[in-house]
Structures are given as structure tokens and as C-alpha cells.
């Protein structure tokens, strides 16, 4: 058949029966197109292509709206055909709206009618689809490759059928695309219900009048997000009326359209439909099952659309109905048939414009929500099923959760309503009184999971924990004033004896301390006082493991005795031990509670021991002669054995007089008494006390081993020394009697860079000194090592008398046991040996005959304590006054002391670098300075009435540490003025040549703990011992692995993603939707022809307010596992390594072993280090938990409500209008937290600029681990993210709250969904800068009654606590 000479005619389909237009037009059109392909016979492919393009364009253009008009979504729009849409550059539409008026009485101005002119942009869009025809198929369809066989004819039919299927698929894509495009258009202009509904309440005359109202609005928004999100999931079971109320609010919070259209949708009874509710199939089904009543199952819908007319240049006026084709019967007759003989029919069509538009009845679900009749539509299956396009109403919601781990409640909250509710094992202490170390919660499947301190190893057991170099650089740029240098400056002692040095120090103390030091004031503060906005020193509390302080700049420590007048700067020193954390942030109650936990099932001192030792430490009449004996023995085992008889008589006499034990202030004496006098020489009860005391010291030593994981030495030190400072040889005991600790200290190696100054010069040891060699006025660096028991040869090398364990036990005794008994009422004293030895030689001993037996009673004239022998200023007087019964044989032994004498009390200043567990390129230059007395004594309770002490005859105060610096003992140094004595009551009078508080290993918080503690001695010894555990990464790895509370808590942050099912409501005729002429572009390709179909579209809103709104109605499923996967910085963070390679390797191995985020295989040379892939996944994508170090005393109630994980509110939404206000809200801690005005923060280690948490998670510092990909904390710590979200929130309120004011025709108002409003239903945590509390508890028993209102549902039981769910998920998981 030859068609070259015939005019091309588009085939006319069969007439469609009336009343079945929408259901049959597709079938008819498809048949027409198929018949056309079947009838084509031509060798001219060009003619075929032209004919096909025209047919295809007309075909698709005609049928695009067929399926769309069957959808309830068509209620919301006015569809208008606009063939010239492709030529529109800048389309705008003008509306005129008359504002309503209210006539009022009284003295009110008379209102005039107000007209508002509003102009809106036309937003241009397009739809595109494509398909291809292979060259072989073209040949078959065109007949060029037909060979006349039946096979070729069959192939041609199959080619035509395949082409028809392709075209049908393209048409189907346009039909689906129209619905998808309009749905997205409606979503673009629909603000969330949680925003739109509150604005109707808090809008004053159309706008938010003040920042107070805006603050109230923000508070309401927060509440509505929690309550309204997932309202269907929460209330569909028990409180269906709340679901109906939320739906009614959704359909009533929008503004009606300005369009008065002739096209109306109605039910079968003729009642107009007010709008459409679009949701998912699941939500639709749940709403129809007992929540909403189905009013009708069919609807009458119009089947016409308008036509655009061009009037003017670039200004398009939309005729809401326009000149319209009457119905789709006319479309089938006239648009698919364009013959000239049908023009007459078109003219008739125009004349019939005034006729009532035709409608078609389609199946629909019509429900009544309140008083509004709406379509209930679900497009999920009808439009989106089997496509690769996600359903827009299935969204993602990211929620960030916060879980407090290890918080210690204040005493008023550590109660139990019924102590018997959770009963421990009979006979055992209640573990619920211990500080919590684990928190339990449920994952997405309702399984109970936990996080403990060990989970945080990947965060703090990392070298970034020690990276403070950038912090120092930053804070040194700020101005600082040096109010008081005492405690922040160290010097060497001046020339002269220690007594002269002490006097010179007290004479010039006021120059170093013109004001009260910060470190003493902080030790007496409460947590509220420390964190108050008025605390100017809060800005230096930046890190849990470092002290930042103002000190003299450009002075090498130790500096000159008189501090030079230099500029101040900020210095940093490692706190070394958790006991040095300031008391307000690690309070005494917590330390004692931890000590009680450690004392359970371990050695405890007998009550008799406690009474006897406590009595000795508090005895104001303790015999002064005992201190004299200590001095002449001066730790010498040889001398002790020589004077054993005298010592026995002293101990026995004091025991009989007071039932207390002597010499408990001297560790060497206790050791010798246990070794030599414990076999019946003393009363059994007395011996048991010394033995019990030593066993307690050894038990404290074993405590360190129990909380240390065994391993190979690192940096030349064992792990117990890296874990507890008392086992570190770098720290000397406060009192030494020989050179043993110094010799053991020298074995540490050069890496510790230890230095030692003895009396200000280098150290040198001498074996011993006899009477002929003694020089009491000696100065310099010589220290007497004491005479050994055997091997007496001064030419032999000087070796220790005892093993290193002796020094360890000595430090444990002095730093843990002595403070527990003395409670700060003791002081290290210097000894005036130039007076002590002459006094010892003044003893009066009566002569006895060779056959006479020494008398035992002082009433005997031959007894040395008989009144006739009590000569003034003799040793006899001291024994007599102390009621110590000694005999002649015992006193004769005193002549042995001259064979091994002490010359002086010598000040020793020792310094050391950090150990291998804390040494990095930043910390290696930080040195500790600790003072020690060689040949000094520890004086217990001060004896106010002893004249020899008051005059400083034999002893004078020489405090080496705040633990041994009782101010009353300064009375033994005559001549001190009242100002010094008064200052010593507030500030420990430790000379700066014995170190300074910030440079000492043991600092003021430990001393104040001993003073303020109300715990018994057993608990306090363990509590003090726990305070000496170190704060380095390696030490923390041991403590976490063994269940030791490190003295700080954590804020756990986790972000989870949930799939949501949203509900969209749109007013009827609220959107004008324009469709241009479809264009077909043909592109020749290798092997065939590609066809690309493009149809321009446009839309414009027809409202003077928001005509659509949506809400997250139901929770579909959690995407993440809501689990307990801890962050591992070794996988995400690069930072300075540990200086010791073994230490760095040890940390990596310990942290990564068993860690689910451990690196996969060896570290690659190129590329990124990736985590190991698990063999299986059961609960979904693992959500990462990050840890923010938090003070253990943080307010637990802060975590019971939505809060900022930093510990302080952030975001411009809280700020005023100043440019710097938003930054000040986030970082200016001189102002209170907007949410908690009485305090600046709840966590100074994270909320302040350059704090540890800020440096760890703030993306501003360009750390590769601080990113939104790896870190859920990123959005809370990064200022740009906070400001961006805050600006979104501010602009959101301003945009949505703006009223339509009288305006000119040039005003353009687009009621679009404000930028950032989607965060209300997608990421509210970043918008509000708050994370939500998750149902969690430190005790699984509390989780068994978690629901509010349930009988017995307690939030706490002693030290344990329960945090209730205050998130939008509350009520969504009834099984949890």
C-alpha cells in the first residue's frame, strides 16, 4: 500500500460510551495507536517518523491526566492546559484578597475595607521519559526487511507489540509522574503540623510580637514534636480520640484557596469535598479500622481542564477555569481527530462552555474529619508500586538520644522508698549503693543491652585524650591576670638550713599570695557555685585530665626564690590522678562511696585497731619523747634493734596508759615493730594492732593489682606503676630516712627525665655518719643513707637497704592510711639534731654495782625516773612527764645512737616527666615537682601546751604537701605574725621550694577529701587509694577493663534513623497546575532510534496562607538497631601518637581487640582504614554511641528532659538580635544557660570553647573524625552547624508567623514550606539543639516498672537511677 500521495490523518478512535470515560479512554486510545502501527506500509522511514512523532505526542498529551483525574489528589488542584508554557520566561499571578472586618462599639477607630494584592511566581517544571526502537524493529515495522515469509510477518507483529508496550510504559510513566509531581509540589508548600498548629495559638495580630512570645513558641514546638510525632502509633490502641483530634487539627490548620472554581468534587449525595488526605496504605487501613468513619465509597469528579491564554509580555493571567474543553468525550472526538471537517464541532464546543461540566463517578474513600469531608487517598500502591521512585510520604526521621553513664546522685536523691523492694543476697552489702558503672536500655527488638565504662575505651583510651597543645595556643591569645602565683610557681630553696629557709618563706609568703588562690577556693565550692556564671575561673576548667592555670610566663621552673615580675600566661599540667579532679566535679560523697565499694570483701581494720590508731593521731598529749626517739633512730634498722628494749618499754607504757599505740606516724617503725617485736615482746592486743595495720597496707597494695590487667612492661615500667601513682618510683614518699626511694627512682631510665635537688643542689649519698664525723651545720646535697646491719664498709657501693616494695608500702601508708586517721591534723616537721643528740646524752642513769639488779619501780632511788634523778633539761624529765616506764638497761642503750647519726633535716625536690602511659609530644615537657623531707618526722596532733614544742626547741614545721600541712603546727615556729597563721588556715602553707599545687602529684582536692570526709577510716583509706589511680589512656584501659570507676562520668550520644509514614492534607483547588505541549525529540543512535518525550509543567499556589500541611503519623520501622556500638577513635581519628612505641601499640591492641569497630586487617598503605565487616547482621544498621566526658556530679535531672549533650543550650533561636549573641549563647559562660539560668553549664569539659569535648567533636578544628558521617555529636559541637540550624529555626518562625499585611501589587509572597521546617519531622534534634532521653537505667530491676503512673515505678533506688523516655518514640514500643 502506497501512502506517499495521501495526506496524513490521525486515526479517530471509536466513540466512547458515555459514563465510562475514564475507564475506557485508555483502551480506545491504545487500540487506535496499535491499529496505526499495524496498518503502516511504507519504504519511507522519514515519512513514518513524522507520522509517528505526531501521533505519539498527541497520544501522550491526551492521556496524561486520565489516571490522575481518578485520584483523590486531583481535589487539590485546578488543571489547566497551556500549550505556550514553553515560551514563558517569568510568569507571575496577581490575587486580590479582601480582609474581613469586625464592627465594634466603644472608642475604637472605624475600620475601612482593606484589599490585599498578592503576586506569586509560576514555578516551571517538566516531565520527561524515553524509549528506544532498535534498527531491526524499525525495519520490520516499516516493511523494509520483510521477505514475504510468515516468520518475518510474525516478527513484525512482535516488533509492533513490543513498541506498543514501550509506548504504554512511557505513557504510564507520565501518568504516574503527574501524580508524583503534584504530590511533591504539595509537600513543598506544606509545613509540618507541629509548626503550623502552634503558630495559630501564639500569633499576636498576625505576627509574633516579642522574643518572649517566640521563646514560648519554641517551647511549645518542642513539646508538640514529642507529643505529635507518631501520634497514630502511640494512641491507636488505647486513646483513639487523640488520633482524631490530631487529624482534625491537621485539616483545620490550613487556609482555604482563593479560587472559586466550577469544578467541584463531591460525594454521591452532592456534598462538596473540602480537601484530600494523602498517606500510606498502612496508615489508611489503620485509620479506616475504627478511627475514622467511611462516609462514602465513591465520588463524582470533574473531567475537564482549563486552557491558558497569553495576554501581554511575560505576564500570564490565569483564568482559573479559562476556556475549557467541556469533557473527555470531546477530547476523544476532537483532540485525537484533527480533520478539518471537525472544526464545526469545535465551534459548537465553545458555545457549550456555559454548560455544567461533566463529571465521572470513581471509586474513592470519603471520610469525615471533624466537620470536613475529605478524600482519604493512598498512592503507595496505585502510583509507586514496582517503581524505583520512593514514596514521598515515607520519610526518614533522625533522632539523637542521650544516656547518662556513671552519674553519682547527691545525698538527697540516694534514697529508696522501700528498701526491701530490691533486696541483696542475705549477709551481703547492697551493690545498689555503689556508684553506677553500667547503663541498660532496649534495642529496637526489645532486647536488653548495656553500655559500661569499658565501652568508652575507644574514646578516652586514645592519645587525643592528652592533646592540649592547640588548647593552650588558643587560650593564650586571651588576656589573663595573675592574681596569685602561690601554687603555680616552684623554686629551689635558698642557702642556709631548712629552718632558715622556712622562716624566709613565711616572711615573703604574702608576696606570692596577695589574694586567695583559686585552687583553695574551688576545693570548698559546691557544684552549683563552681558552675555558676559568676565564677570567673570556670573558663579554665576545660579538661578532666589537665589543670589549666595562670602562671608567670617565660620563667623556667624551678625559678628564682623571689618570683620575677613578668607577664602572666596560661599553663597546663596533667592532673595525673583522678583524686586531683576538683571536688565540686568529683565530690567527697562519691569518693567515699567508691571507697566503700572497694572495701567490701577486702581487708578491713578491726575496730580495736581503728580506735587505738585514731586515738594516737588525735592525742594532744602524745609523748614528745617518742618523736625524739624516732629522730635518733631515723629509720635505721640497726639502731632500732639496738634500742629494742627501750622501744618495747615505750610502747607498753603508752598502751597501758591510753590503750593506744605508739609510733604509728612512722612507717619504718611499724615495719620494724612487726618484724622484731611481734613474737611476744608486746601485749598480744597491741601486737595485733600493728599487724593489722600492716596487713591493711598490704591489702591496699593488692587492690592495685586487682584493678590492673597483667601484661608486659611498657616503657620500662610495669602496668601497676602505670595504673597507680603510688607504685610509680618517680613519686617519693613524703618522709625518707635513707636513700632507698632515690636509688629505686634512678632505675626508671632517662625517658622520665627525673631530676633531684637536695637542698637546692645535686644529690649525693654518703653511707653513714658517726659522732666524730657529724656536722649539724652541714648544707649541700649530701644525704645520709644509714648504716647497714651487716657488711659495714664505707667503700662499698651504696645499695638499697630494702626492696622497692618497701618504698611502695611506705607511700601507701603515708598517702592513704595516715590521712584517713589524721584528717589533716598532722604536719611534717624538721628536726634540730644539734639539740636532739645533746638531749639524748643528758640522760641521768644511777650507778649500780656489779651484783645489783636494776630496779623496776620509779619509787626505788636507784631508778632513773626517781624524783631525785629528774634533773631539768634532761631526757629523764621527758620520760617522766609522759609516764613512760623505762629502766636503766633500756636507757643505757641510747649510747648506741652515736654510731649512726643524722645531721639535719634536708629538703628534697624531685621532678619527673610523664610516664609511658601519658607521654606524648605535647606532655613530655610537663614536669611534676614534689617535695620530700630526709630525716624529718611526721607530727600528729599538735601539743599546744608543750613548751619545748612552742619554742621550737627540737622540731619546727616543714610541710611538704597539703596532706601534711596542719596550720596549728606553725605554732612550733616562734615569731610568725598573725597574718601568716590566719592565712595558713585557708591555704596549705607548703613552701614553693617543696613544689606548687599545680605541679604536685598530690594536690589540694585529695587533701580536702581527707579533711571533709565523714566516712570511717576503713572506707576512707580505700577511697584515698582509689584517688591515686592515674588518668592516662593506659591507666584508664586497665580501670575500664576491671570495673573501676575512673572518677568521671559519660554522656552517651547515639543517633538513630526511623522510617516514618506521613499524612498530607491539602485544601481543595489550592494549587493551579499547568501542562504544556508535549515534545518528542528523536535521536539517532547506533543500532536504533531513541525517543525522548518532554512535557513542560508549571504550578502556582492559590492561597493567601498555607493551604497544605503534613505530619509524621506513624512509625514504620527503625532503620538502625538502637544498640550499643561504641565509637572507636582509632578507626576515625588521627592524632599525635604516644611517644613510647610500645605504649601506642599496646593501646591500639587493647582497644581494638573485640571492638566491633576495630580496623579490618593491617593498616593499608593507601586508602582509608575500614572497620571489619561482621559475618551477619540481625538488628539493622548499627548506630554508633559516642561518649562525652562529664563530671560525675552533673545534675541528673538535666538528663531527664531533652537537653543539649554539650551541657549548655546552643543556637541562635535563644539569642537576641545582636551579631555576637548566638556565639555568646553557645560559649559565653559568664552568662547563664538560657534553659538553666542559675548555672552556666552542666559540663564545663564539653560546653566551653577549647574544652576537651569541644576539641574532640567540633568540626571547626578539621579533625577527620569530627564529621556528620562518623559523629552524632558533630551537629551539637560545630558552630557553623548550630548557627545554620538556628538560623533556619529563626527564619522558620519569622516566615510562618508573618501575616498578610496591606501591600502593593509589587509585593511577592510565596507561601512555601519555610527552609528548615522539614527538620521538625526529619531531624528535630539538630533544629532544637537537643537530644532526647532514652528509657535507660543503671539497674535492670528498675526497668521492670518503667511506666509512669504504674504502682512501684520508682526512678531511683539508692545510687541507681532510671531515666524515662521523653522522646517522640515514647509509647511507640509497648513491648519495651
Swiss-Prot record:
GO cellular component term of the entry, any: host cell nucleus
Key words, A-Z: Capsid protein, Host nucleus, T=16 icosahedral capsid protein, Virion
InterPro entries in the record: Herpes_MCP, Herpes_MCP_upper_sf
Pfam families: Herpes_MCP (PF03122)
UniProt-annotated location(s): Virion; Host nucleus
SUPFAM superfamilies on file: Major capsid protein VP5
Main subcellular location: virion
A GO MF term: structural molecule activity
Subunit structure and binding partners: Homomultimer. Makes the hexons and eleven out of twelve pentons. Interacts with triplex proteins 1/TRX1 and 2/TRX2; adjacent capsomers are linked together in groups of three by triplexes, heterotrimeric complexes composed of one molecule of TRX1 and two molecules of TRX2. Interacts with scaffold protein; this interaction allows efficient MCP transport to the host nucleus. Interacts with capsid vertex component 2/CVC2. Interacts with the small capsomere-interacting protein/SCP.
Family statement drawn from the similarity comment of this UniProt entry: Belongs to the herpesviridae major capsid protein family.
Biological role: Self-assembles to form an icosahedral capsid with a T=16 symmetry, about 200 nm in diameter, and consisting of 150 hexons and 12 pentons (total of 162 capsomers). Hexons form the edges and faces of the capsid and are each composed of six MCP molecules. In contrast, one penton is found at each of the 12 vertices. Eleven of the pentons are MCP pentamers, while the last vertex is occupied by the portal complex.
Protein name (database record): Major capsid protein
Organism: Equine herpesvirus 1 (strain Ab4p)
Amino acid at each position: 500500500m502506497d501512502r506517499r500521495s495521501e495526506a496524513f490523518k490521525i486515526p479517530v478512535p471509536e466513540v466512547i460510551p458515555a459514563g465510562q470515560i475514564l475507564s475506557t479512554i485508555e483502551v480506545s486510545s491504545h487500540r487506535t495507536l496499535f491499529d496505526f502501527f499495524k496498518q503502516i506500509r511504507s519504504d519511507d522511514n522519514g515519512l513514518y517518523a513524522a507520522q509517528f512523532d505526531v501521533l505519539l505526542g498527541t497520544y501522550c498529551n491526551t492521556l496524561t491526566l486520565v489516571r490522575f483525574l481518578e485520584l483523590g489528589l486531583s481535589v487539590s488542584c485546578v488543571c489547566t492546559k497551556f500549550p505556550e508554557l514553553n515560551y514563558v520566561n517569568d510568569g507571575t499571578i496577581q490575587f486580590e484578597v479582601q480582609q474581613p472586618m469586625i464592627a465594634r462599639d466603644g472608642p475604637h477607630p472605624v475600620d475601612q475595607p482593606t484589599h490585599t494584592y498578592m503576586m506569586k511566581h509560576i514555578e516551571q517544571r517538566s516531565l520527561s521519559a524515553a524509549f528506544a526502537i532498535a534498527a531491526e524493529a524499525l525495519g520490520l515495522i516499516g516493511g523494509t526487511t520483510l521477505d514475504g515469509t510468515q516468520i518475518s510477518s510474525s516478527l513484525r507483529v512482535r516488533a509492533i507489540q513490543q513498541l506498543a508496550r514501550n509506548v504504554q510504559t512511557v505513557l504510564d510513566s507520565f501518568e504516574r509522574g503527574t501524580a508524583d509531581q503534584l504530590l511533591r509540589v504539595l509537600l513543598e508548600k506544606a509545613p509540618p503540623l507541629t509548626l503550623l498548629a502552634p503558630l495559630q495559638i501564639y500569633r499576636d495580630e498576625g505576627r509574633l510580637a516579642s522574643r518572649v512570645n517566640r521563646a514560648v513558641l519554641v517551647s511549645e514546638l518542642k513539646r508538640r514534636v514529642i507529643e505529635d510525632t507518631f501520634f497514630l502509633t502511640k494512641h491507636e490502641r488505647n486513646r483513639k480520640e487523640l488520633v482524631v483530634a490530631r487529624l482534625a487539627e491537621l485539616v483545620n490548620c490550613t487556609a482555604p484557596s482563593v479560587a472559586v472554581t466550577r469544578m467541584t468534587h463531591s460525594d454521591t449525595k452532592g456534598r462538596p469535598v473540602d480537601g484530600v488526605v494523602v498517606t500510606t496504605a498502612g496508615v489508611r487501613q489503620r485509620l479506616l479500622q475504627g478511627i475514622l468513619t467511611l462516609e462514602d465509597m465513591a465520588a463524582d469528579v470533574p473531567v475537564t481542564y482549563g486552557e491558558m491564554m497569553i495576554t501581554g509580555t511575560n505576564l500570564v493571567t490565569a483564568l482559573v477555569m479559562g476556556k475549557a474543553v467541556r469533557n473527555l468525550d470531546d477530547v476523544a472526538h476532537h483532540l485525537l481527530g484533527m480533520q478539518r471537517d471537525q472544526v464545526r464541532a469545535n465551534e459548537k464546543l465553545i458555545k457549550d462552555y456555559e454548560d455544567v461540566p461533566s463529571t465521572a463517578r470513581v471509586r474513592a474513600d470519603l471520610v469525615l474529619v471533624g466537620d470536613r469531608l475529605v478524600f482519604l487517598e493512598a498512592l503507595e500502591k496505585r502510583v509507586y508500586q514496582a517503581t524505583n521512585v520512593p514514596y514521598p510520604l515515607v520519610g526518614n526521621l533522625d533522632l539523637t538520644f542521650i544516656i547518662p553513664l556513671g552519674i553519682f546522685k547527691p545525698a538527697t536523691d540516694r534514697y529508696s522508698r522501700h528498701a526491701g523492694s530490691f533486696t541483696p543476697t542475705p549477709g551481703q552489702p547492697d551493690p545498689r549503693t555503689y556508684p553506677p558503672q553500667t547503663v541498660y536500655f532496649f534495642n529496637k527488638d526489645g532486647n536488653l543491652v548495656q553500655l559500661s565504662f569499658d565501652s568508652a575505651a575507644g574514646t578516652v583510651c586514645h592519645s587525643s585524650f592528652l592533646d592540649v597543645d592547640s588548647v593552650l595556643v588558643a587560650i593564650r591569645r586571651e588576656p589573663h591576670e595573675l592574681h596569685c602565683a602561690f601554687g603555680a610557681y616552684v623554686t629551689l630553696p635558698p642557702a642556709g638550713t631548712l629552718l632558715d629557709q622556712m622562716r624566709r618563706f613565711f616572711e615573703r609568703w604574702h608576696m606570692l599570695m596577695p589574694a586567695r588562690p583559686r585552687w583553695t577556693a574551688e576545693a570548698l565550692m559546691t557544684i552549683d557555685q563552681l558552675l555558676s556564671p559568676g565564677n570567673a575561673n570556670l573558663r579554665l576548667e576545660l579538661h578532666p585530665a589537665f589543670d589549666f592555670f595562670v602562671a608567670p610566663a617565660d620563667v623556667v621552673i624551678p625559678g628564682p626564690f623571689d618570683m620575677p615580675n613578668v607577664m602572666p600566661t596560661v599553663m597546663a599540667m596533667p592532673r595525673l590522678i583522678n583524686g586531683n579532679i576538683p571536688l565540686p566535679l568529683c565530690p567527697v560523697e562519691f569518693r567515699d562511696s567508691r571507697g566503700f565499694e572497694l572495701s567490701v570483701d577486702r581487708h578491713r581494720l578491726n575496730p580495736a585497731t581503728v580506735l587505738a590508731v585514731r586515738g594516737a593521731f588525735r592525742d594532744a598529749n602524745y609523748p614528745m619523747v617518742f618523736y625524739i626517739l624516732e629522730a635518733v633512730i631515723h629509720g635505721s634498722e640497726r639502731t632500732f634493734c639496738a634500742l629494742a628494749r627501750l622501744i618495747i618499754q615505750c610502747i607498753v607504757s603508752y598502751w597501758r596508759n591510753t590503750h593506744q599505740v605508739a609510733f604509728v606516724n612512722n612507717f619504718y617503725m611499724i615495719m620494724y615493730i612487726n618484724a622484731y617485736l611481734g613474737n611476744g615482746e608486746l601485749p598480744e592486743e597491741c601486737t595485733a594492732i600493728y599487724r593489722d595495720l600492716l596487713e591493711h597496707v598490704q591489702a591496699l597494695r593488692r587492690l592495685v593489682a586487682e584493678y590492673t590487667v597483667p601484661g608486659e612492661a611498657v616503657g620500662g615500667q610495669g602496668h601497676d606503676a602505670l595504673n597507680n601513682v603510688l607504685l610509680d618510683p618517680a613519686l617519693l614518699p613524703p618522709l625518707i630516712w635513707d636513700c632507698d626511694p632515690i636509688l629505686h627512682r634512678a632505675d626508671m631510665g632517662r625517658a622520665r627525665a627525673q631530676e633531684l635537688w637536695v637542698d637546692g643542689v645535686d644529690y649525693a649519698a654518703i653511707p653513714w655518719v658517726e659522732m666524730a664525723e657529724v656536722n649539724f651545720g652541714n648544707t649541700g646535697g649530701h644525704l645520709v643513707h644509714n648504716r647497714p646491719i651487716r657488711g659495714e664498709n664505707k667503700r662499698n657501693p651504696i645499695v638499697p637497704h630494702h626492696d622497692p616494695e618497701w618504698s611502695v608500702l611506705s607511700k601507701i601508708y603515708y598517702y592513704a592510711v595516715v590521712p584517713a586517721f589524721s584528717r589533716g591534723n598532722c604536719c611534717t616537721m624538721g628536726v634540730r639534731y644539734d639539740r636532739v643528740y645533746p638531749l639524748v646524752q643528758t640522760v641521768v642513769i644511777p650507778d649500780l654495782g656489779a651484783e645489783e639488779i636494776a630496779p623496776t619501780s620509779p619509787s626505788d632511788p636507784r631508778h632513773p625516773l626517781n624524783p631525785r634523778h629528774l634533773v631539768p633539761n634532761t631526757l629523764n624529765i621527758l620520760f617522766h612527764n609522759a609516764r613512760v616506764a623505762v629502766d636503766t638497761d633500756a636507757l643505757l642503750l641510747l649510747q648506741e645512737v652515736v654510731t649512726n647519726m643524722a645531721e639535719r633535716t634536708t629538703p628534697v625536690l624531685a621532678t619527673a616527666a610523664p610516664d609511658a602511659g601519658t607521654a606524648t609530644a605535647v606532655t613530655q615537657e610537663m614536669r611534676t615537682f614534689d617535695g620530700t623531707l630526709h630525716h624529718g618526722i611526721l607530727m600528729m596532733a599538735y601539743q599546744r601546751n608543750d613548751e619545748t614544742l612552742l619554742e621550737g626547741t627540737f622540731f619546727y614545721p616543714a610541710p611538704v604537701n597539703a596532706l601534711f600541712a596542719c596550720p596549728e603546727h606553725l605554732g612550733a615556729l616562734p615569731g610568725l605574725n598573725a597574718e601568716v597563721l590566719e592565712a595558713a588556715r585557708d591555704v596549705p602553707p607548703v613552701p614553693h621550694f617543696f613544689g606548687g599545687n599545680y605541679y604536685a602529684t598530690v594536690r589540694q582536692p585529695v587533701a580536702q577529701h581527707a579533711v571533709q570526709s565523714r566516712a570511717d577510716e576503713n572506707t576512707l583509706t580505700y577511697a584515698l587509694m582509689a584517688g591515686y589511680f592515674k588518668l592516662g589512656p593506659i591507666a584508664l584501659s586497665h580501670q575500664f577493663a576491671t570495673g573501676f570507676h575512673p572518677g568521671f562520668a559519660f554522656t552517651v550520644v547515639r543517633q538513630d534513623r526511623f522510617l516514618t509514614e506521613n499524612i498530607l492534607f491539602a485544601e481543595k483547588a489550592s494549587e493551579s497546575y499547568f501542562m504544556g505541549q508535549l515534545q518528542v525529540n528523536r535521536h539517532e543512535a547506533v543500532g536504533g532510534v531513541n525517543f525522548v518525550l518532554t512535557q513542560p509543567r508549571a504550578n502556582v499556589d492559590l492561597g493567601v496562607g498555607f493551604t497544605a500541611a503534613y505530619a509524621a503519623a506513624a512509625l514504620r520501622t527503625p532503620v538502625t538497631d538502637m544498640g550499643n556500638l561504641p565509637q572507636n577513635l582509632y578507626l576515625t581519628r588521627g592524632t599525635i601518637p604516644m611517644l613510647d612505641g610500645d605504649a601506642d601499640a599496646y593501646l591500639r591492641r587493647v582497644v581494638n581487640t573485640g571492638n566491633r569497630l576495630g580496623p579490618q586487617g593491617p593498616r593499608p598503605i593507601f586508602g582509608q582504614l575500614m572497620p571489619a565487616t561482621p559475618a551477619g547482621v540481625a538488628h539493622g544498621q548499627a548506630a554508633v554511641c559516642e561518649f562525652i566526658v562529664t563530671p560525675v556530679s552533673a545534675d541528673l535531672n538535666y538528663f531527664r528532659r531533652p537537653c543539649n549533650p554539650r551541657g549548655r543550650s546552643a543556637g541562635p533561636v535563644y539569642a537576641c538580635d545582636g551579631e555576637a549573641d548566638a556565639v555568646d549563647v553557645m560559649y559565653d559562660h559568664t552568662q547563664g544557660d538560657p534553659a538553666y539560668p542559675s548555672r552556666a553549664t552542666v559540663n564545663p569539659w564539653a560546653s566551653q570553647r577549647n574544652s576537651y569535648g569541644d576539641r574532640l567533636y567540633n568540626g571547626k578544628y578539621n579533625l577527620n573524625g569530627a564529621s556528620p558521617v562518623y559523629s552524632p555529636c558533630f551537629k551539637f559541637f560545630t558552630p557553623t552547624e548550630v548557627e545554620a540550624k538556628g538560623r533556619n529555626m529563626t527564619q522558620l518562625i519569622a516566615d510562618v508567623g508573618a501575616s498578610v499585611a496591606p501591600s502593593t501589587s509589587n509585593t511577592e509572597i510565596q507561601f512555601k514550606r519555610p527552609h528548615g521546617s522539614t527538620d521538625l519531622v526529619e531531624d528535630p534534634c539538630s533544629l532544637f539543639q537537643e537530644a532526647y532521653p532514652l528509657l535507660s537505667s543503671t539497674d535492670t530491676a528498675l526497668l521492670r516498672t518503667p511506666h509512669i503512673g504504674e504502682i512501684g515505678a520508682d526512678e531511683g533506688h539508692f545510687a541507681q537511677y532510671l531515666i524515662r523516655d521523653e522522646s517522640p518514640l515514647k509509647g511507640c514500643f509497648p513491648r519495651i
